[in-house]
């Protein structure tokens, strides 16, 4: 039987963004760990390095490493869980691993690992640096679609839904807009890059003009904070668009917000979310013509729209719940049996 575990969670909690990213996946994972009864201590690495500037310590890397060492010595964790921690070097991780041999090391990594996608070499390098030292690794892409990971220590996790954050039930009411679309050029940047274009813009430009849209991140800036949820809450349907070519199971973390708040969600079939959801819970499409046809079908059948959105909402809250995902991370890391098994856990 698994006892309560002391976990040092080193991940960006976005304090410097003043609430703009209060619904981040890192926060949802953290909430799940606490709700599961674990003793969790946080280091928000990018906030630490942002607050302490020193011309003799570029990027405040030495300062961050010393903070981590002090926290380990005082807290004595059973497990260290890393998020996107990019200010530590190979030698830093090597020292941690050699110095604290009894501590389990794990990482979660949510960015795309798509060869024909954005920042592939950079993201691969960021992931692999920690991968070398971690007992377990958790990614939002199917390990079977990536050729440089060991499937015995690398596992898929979906983007988490947190019922304390994803509180809306859009499937129960009528809305001002038909379709919600939100994209960005990076959550840390927050605003659009000038003259930037990618596959998502091409898809948006080819969408049917017979429905009304609530779109952010194309001609206007992305929407963040509570405004994101207020705009989402004006819509009955949403299209989940991620950068790069489709790869098995990968999605931006908006997928959790769309399903988790009761929108009828469209996603390309090459992401294989039909492995998790039936056609009565989510809508997959083959190409832009198929997508446009299905958008019009559900716009003209509100009863069916709400039924599928409701089913998707219930299923997503059941299988993508942050408590479930956080429990999976801990159990896999310590080699405990996973009790509640769902379709995504087989990857």
Regions found by a protein language model. Name each.
Residues 282-289, 298-302:
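Conserved acidic donor-binding segment of nucleotide-sugar-dependent glycosyltransferases
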Residues 61-62:
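N-terminal accessory alpha/beta regions
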Residues 2-55, 67, 75, 84-91, ...:
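Nucleotide-sugar donor-binding catalytic core of glycosyltransferases
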Residues 106-120:
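A short, histidine- and acid-enriched strand-loop-helix "catalytic/donor-clamping" loop
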Residues 83-84, 97-105:
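Short, conserved structural micro-motifs that define repeat-unit consensus positions
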Residues 72, 76-78:
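Proline-aspartate-enriched helix->loop->beta-strand connector
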Residues 93-100, 208:
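Surface-exposed amphipathic alpha-helices with a cationic face
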Residues 294-298, 302-347:
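C-terminal amphipathic helix plus adjacent low-complexity
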